[in-house]
């Protein structure tokens, strides 16, 4: 008889009971997000979802994303309640730019050692994000992987599927010189540029947990969840039919994201003086001595979404967005791009 002790999965660092406890805790979160098209609850091998009624030629739109190294800041600050909102926002905001209504969302949560309380906070945030975007949380994967992650550190990924009527896909092909560009404000850096943000904090030696800007803790400003624009934008599309293109301003800022939805030969002229940049961006620029163009190439600088409409629809679009609770403004317009010119020109850049 071998004297070798009997090994279990728990001895190897995987706690099946903890995983099951987490599933029980998050079932109610998923239930709150349920859409009528979703068939069944959590726990099956696959999630089933019907196409909503009323579509003649439905086209499915998919997207996947993470939250970048904002997650490292969340871990350092032990703040896990809103990072799930960020995860959903990064996916659903990408879907809505082509006119798609988000249908369902799945998440992937990988960790070295599963902390049920932390994971439940994260998934509760994911549920909140799904509710804000009218999307169902239909499943996910929680992977406890000892030896792959340090202690209770975790990584997150999200996956979302939406639907749009084929004839109503918004692809930027109708954008023309003279069109107006509208902007919607961000809540802060959203989920991009955090490797630079963390480097600025490190190099400057700033005590972010004891710093306030405009009477608000800096940590709250840096961790403010990414805004979810789905419902106001779907209302704008439905009520006006005027949207020609939309750009979700993520990694790469205005300079890299607006060109993704512009046809060849079009140039966006953006007036940087058209909005007051939130104080958190000025703080980051000052502490990191960051060049002005670099700021706009890495961070959203206060702009979360850009919308293109014809000039005759500007006032209607602004009013619909205001009625939906947004604070839109005209940020620029479309011009014919000069030969060899960049597709985005930033006007009135402040001297650094």
Swiss-Prot record:
Origin superkingdom: Bacteria
EC category name: ligase
Alphabetical list of Pfam families matching this protein: AIRS (PF00586), AIRS_C (PF02769)
GO cellular component: cytosol
The keyword S-adenosyl-L-methionine belongs to this UniProt entry's keyword annotation: no
Keywords assigned by UniProt, alphabetized: ATP-binding, Cytoplasm, Ligase, Nucleotide-binding, Purine biosynthesis
CDD domains the record matches: PurM (cd02196)
GO molecular function terms listed in the Swiss-Prot or TrEMBL record: ATP binding; phosphoribosylamine-glycine ligase activity; phosphoribosylformylglycinamidine cyclo-ligase activity
Cellular compartments annotated: Cytoplasm
EC number: 6.3.3.1
Principal location: cytoplasm
Catalytic activity annotation: 2-formamido-N(1)-(5-O-phospho-beta-D-ribosyl)acetamidine + ATP = 5-amino-1-(5-phospho-beta-D-ribosyl)imidazole + ADP + phosphate + H(+)
Tagged with keyword Ligase: yes
Family according to the record: Belongs to the AIR synthase family.
PANTHER family for this protein: TRIFUNCTIONAL PURINE BIOSYNTHETIC PROTEIN ADENOSINE-3, TRIFUNCTIONAL PURINE BIOSYNTHETIC PROTEIN ADENOSINE-3-RELATED
Protein name according to UniProt: Phosphoribosylformylglycinamidine cyclo-ligase
Gene: purM
């Amino acid at each position: 008889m071998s004297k070798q002790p009997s090994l279990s999965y728990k001895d190897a660092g995987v706690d099946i009971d903890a995983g099951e406890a987490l599933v029980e805790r998050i079932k109610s979160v998923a239930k709150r997000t349920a859409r009528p098209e979703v068939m069944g609850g959590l726990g099956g091998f696959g999630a089933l979802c019907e196409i909503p009624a009323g579509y003649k030629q439905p086209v499915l739109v998919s997207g996947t994303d993470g939250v970048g190294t904002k997650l490292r800041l969340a871990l350092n600050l032990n703040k896990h309640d809103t990072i799930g909102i960020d995860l959903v926002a990064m996916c659903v905001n990408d879907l809505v730019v082509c006119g798609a209504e988000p249908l369902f969302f799945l998440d992937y949560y990988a960790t070295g050692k599963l902390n049920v309380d932390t994971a439940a906070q994260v998934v509760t945030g994911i549920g909140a994000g799904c509710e804000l975007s009218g999307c169902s949380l239909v499943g996910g994967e929680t992977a406890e992987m000892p030896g792959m992650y340090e202690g209770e550190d975790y990584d997150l990924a999200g996956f979302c599927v939406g639907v749009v009527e084929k004839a109503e896909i918004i692809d930027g092909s109708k954008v023309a010189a003279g069109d107006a560009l509208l902007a919607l404000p961000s809540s802060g850096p959203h989920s991009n540029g955090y490797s630079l943000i963390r480097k600025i904090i490190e190099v400057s030696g700033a005590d972010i947990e004891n710093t306030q800007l405009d009477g608000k803790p800096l940590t709250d400003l840096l961790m403010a969840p990414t805004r979810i624009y789905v419902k106001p934008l779907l209302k704008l599309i439905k009520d006006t039919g005027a949207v020609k293109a939309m750009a979700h301003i993520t990694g790469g800022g205005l300079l890299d994201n607006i060109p993704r939805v512009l046809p060849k030969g079009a140039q966006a002229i953006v007036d940087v003086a058209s909005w007051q940049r939130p104080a958190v961006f000025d703080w980051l620029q000052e502490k990191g001595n960051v060049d002005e163009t670099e700021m706009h190439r890495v961070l959203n600088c206060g702009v979360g979404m850009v919308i293109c409409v014809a000039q005759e629809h500007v006032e209607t679009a602004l009013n619909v967005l205001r009625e939906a609770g947004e604070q839109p403004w005209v940020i620029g317009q479309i011009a014919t791009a000069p030969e060899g010119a960049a597709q985005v020109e930033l006007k009135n850049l402040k001297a650094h």
